[in-house]
Curated annotation (Swiss-Prot):
One of its GO terms (molecular function) is RNA binding. Disulfide bonds: none annotated. Its main location: plastid. Usually encoded in the trnK tRNA gene intron. Probably assists in splicing its own and other chloroplast group II introns. Keywords: Chloroplast, mRNA processing, Plastid, RNA-binding, tRNA processing. GO terms for biological process: mRNA processing; RNA splicing; tRNA processing. It comes from the Eukaryota. InterPro entries: Domain_X, Maturase_MatK, Maturase_MatK_N. One of its GO terms (cellular component) is chloroplast. The keyword tRNA processing applies. This is Maturase K. It is found in: Plastid, Chloroplast. The gene is matK.
Length: 504
C-alpha cells in the first residue's frame, strides 16, 4: 500500500473532484489486480481477490480499455450487439467487466484511507478475533438472555438505480464520475433483458459496494434516530458488522440529516436496544412490550417506503418472542430456554432449598434445512437417507475420502457451538455412510463387503479435530459421559458462512 501512497493521498478538494481521471491511469488497474497488495492488506473485504479476472489481466488489455474510454462513442453499445463486434479479440462485455472492477476500487480508496484515520489512535485488543462469525454468539448469549423480543428484518434489495446514484452524491462531488457510474448501471439493466449469464456481466465486487453503500445510508438514519431517542448510548460493536469500512460515513450522514429530524421521536425511546446486521438481514433485540415492537416494525416499513422509494411489506419484519419462537441466525436456531437451578443453602443448623430459574440462550442446528442442502448436493435424499455420490466415482480413493473428511470437519467446526450435538452426529453419519457407499460403488461392491475388506479404520479418518482435542483435555470417563454432549465451543477463526447455510 505504501507503494501507491503518493498516488492516493489527495487533499480535500482533489479527493472530491478528481476521481474520474483515475479511470485513465494504468497504476489503478495494477492496484485492482495486484495479488501482493491484497495479501498485505489485513482487511480482506477492502481489496477482494478475483482469480478469474487475474487470468485475463494484461497491460495491453488495460491500454486498449483506456483508449476505448477516450472514444466515448465506442462505449455506447447496442444491446443486440453485446456479444458481437469483438474489439481486439475481446467482446464488448469484457471491457465493461474491467470498468466495473475499476470503479469499485476507485470508490473504495477514499473509504480505506478514511477508515485508517478513523481507527488511528484507537486501541483494539485482539480485534482480529472479533472478525470471526462465532465471536458474535458469546455476545448474544450475554445480551439476549436479558431480552424477550427480537425484530427480524429482511433488508430489501434491489432498489431503484437512481437512488444508488443519489446516495453516492453525498460524498462524491465529481459530476463526471457520477454520470459514468449512472451510465454503467443503466447499461447493466439493458443487459438483464437479454439472455446473458449474470456472472459474465459485472464483477460481484461492484455490486458488493453498491449494496453496502445502500445499507450504510439506511443505517446512518437508523443510528441517528436511535441516538436522538435516548440519552443512554448502547455499547458499540461496529467491528462485528460486515464491511466495517463503511461505518466511517456515519458521522458524515449525521450532519446531513440533522435538519430533517428536528423532533425527538419519544415513542421509540428505549435505552436497552441492540442491533446486529448479517447476511442481508438485521435483528433488533430489546426488552419491551409488543406495542413498542410494532412501532419499530412500522418505522422500518415507512423508512424504506418513504425515503428509499422501496415497496417494503410488513411481512418482511418478524417479531419473535425468544421464549416461544426460534430465531434463525447465521445457520443456527436460537431461542431462550428456562433451566431450573436447584441450590441448597444452609444457615446455622437449618438447611433449605432455593429453586432458581436461569435463562439460557439455546442454539440448535436447523437439521431440516441442512438435510435439504445435502439432498440438493446428492449426498442423501430428502428424508436424510445417505446415497452414493456418483459424480465422484471417477476420482481416486484418497481424493474421495479427503473430500468427505474435509466437509465433515468443516461442518463440525462451524456447528461446534450447538447446545445439543445429536443433530450434528446425524449429519456426520450421513456423510460417513455416503462416503462408504461412494467407494463401494466405485469398486462395484456392497457396503458390507467393502467395510469387511478394509476394516473399521476407514471411518477413523472422520474423527474431527474437536474430538481429538477434547479427548486429550478431558478425562476418558468425562469424555464418554453425557456432560461432554452439552459442551459448546466457539472458534475465533471462522470468517465465512458454511456452504450449507446458503442452501436457499
Amino acid at each position: 500500500m505504501e507503494k501507491f501512497q503518493g498516488y492516493l493521498e489527495f487533499d480535500g478538494a482533489r479527493q472530491q473532484s478528481f476521481l474520474y481521471p483515475l479511470f485513465f491511469r494504468e497504476y489503478i488497474y495494477v492496484l485492482a489486480y495486484d495479488h501482493g497488495l491484497n495479501r498485505l492488506n489485513r482487511n480482506r473485504s477492502i481489496f477482494l481477490e478475483n482469480a478469474d479476472y487475474d487470468k485475463k489481466y494484461s497491460s495491453l488489455i488495460v491500454k486498449r480499455s483506456i483508449l476505448r474510454m477516450y472514444e466515448q462513442n465506442r462505449l455506447i453499445i447496442p444491446t443486440k450487439d453485446l456479444n458481437q463486434n469483438p474489439f481486439f479479440g475481446h467482446t464488448n462485455i469484457f471491457y465493461y467487466q474491467i470498468i466495473s472492477v475499476l470503479f469499485a476500487v476507485i470508490v473504495e480508496i477514499p473509504f480505506s484511507l478514511r477508515l485508517g484515520s478513523y481507527f488511528e489512535g484507537k486501541k483494539f485488543k485482539k480485534s482480529y478475533n472479533l472478525q470471526s462469525i462465532h465471536s458474535i454468539f458469546p455476545f448474544l448469549e450475554d445480551k439476549l438472555s436479558h431480552f424477550n423480543y427480537v425484530l427480524d428484518v429482511l433488508i430489501p434489495y434491489p432498489i431503484h438505480l437512481e437512488i444508488l446514484v443519489q446516495i453516492l452524491r453525498y460524498w462524491v462531488k465529481d459530476a463526471s464520475s457520477l454520470h459514468f457510474f449512472r451510465f454503467c448501471l443503466y447499461e447493466y439493466c439493458n443487459w438483464k433483458n437479454f439472455d446473458i449469464k449474470k456472472k459474465c456481466i459485472l464483477n460481484p465486487r461492484f455490486f458488493l459496494f453498491l449494496y453496502n453503500s445502500h445499507v450504510c445510508e439506511y443505517e446512518s438514519i437508523f443510528f441517528f434516530l436511535r441516538k436522538r431517542s435516548s440519552h443512554l448510548r448502547s455499547t458499540s460493536y461496529e467491528v462485528l458488522f460486515e464491511r466495517i469500512l463503511f461505518y466511517g460515513k456515519v458521522q458524515h450522514f449525521l450532519k446531513v440529516f440533522v435538519n430533517n429530524f428536528p423532533a425527538i421521536p419519544g415513542l421509540l425511546t428505549d435505552p436497552f436496544l441492540h442491533y446486529v446486521r448479517y447476511h442481508g438481514k438485521c435483528i433488533l433485540a430489546t426488552k419491551d412490550t409488543p406495542l413498542l415492537m410494532n412501532k419499530w416494525k412500522f418505522f422500518f416499513v415507512y423508512l424504506w417506503q418513504c425515503y428509499f422509494s422501496v415497496w417494503f411489506q410488513s411481512q418482511k419484519v418478524n417479531i419473535n418472542q425468544l421464549s416461544k419462537d426460534n430465531l434463525e441466525f447465521l445457520g443456527y436456531l436460537s431461542s431462550l430456554r428456562l433451566n431450573p437451578l436447584v441450590v441448597r443453602s444452609q444457615m446455622l443448623e437449618n438447611s433449605f432449598i432455593i429453586d432458581n430459574v436461569r435463562i439460557k440462550l439455546d442454539s440448535k442446528i436447523p437439521i431440516s434445512s441442512i438435510i435439504l442442502s445435502l439432498a440438493k448436493d446428492k449426498f442423501c435424499n430428502v428424508l436424510g437417507h445417505p446415497i452414493s455420490k456418483a459424480t465422484w466415482t471417477d476420482s481416486s480413493d484418497s481424493d474421495i475420502l479427503n473430500r468427505f473428511v474435509r466437509i465433515c470437519r468443516n461442518i463440525s467446526h462451524y456447528y461446534s457451538g450447538s447446545s445439543k450435538k445429536k443433530n450434528l452426529y446425524r449429519i456426520k453419519y450421513i456423510l460417513r455412510l455416503c462416503c462408504v457407499k461412494t467407494l463401494a460403488r466405485k469398486h462395484k461392491s456392497t457396503v458390507r463387503a467393502f467395510l469387511k475388506r478394509l476394516g473399521s479404520g476407514l471411518l477413523e479418518e472422520f474423527l474431527t479435530g474437536e474430538d481429538q482435542v477434547l479427548s486429550l483435555i478431558f478425562p476418558r470417563s468425562y469424555y464418554a459421559s453425557k456432560r461432554l454432549y452439552r459442551v459448546r465451543i466457539w472458534y475465533l477463526d471462522i470468517l465465512y458462512l458454511n456452504d450449507l447455510v446458503n442452501h436457499e
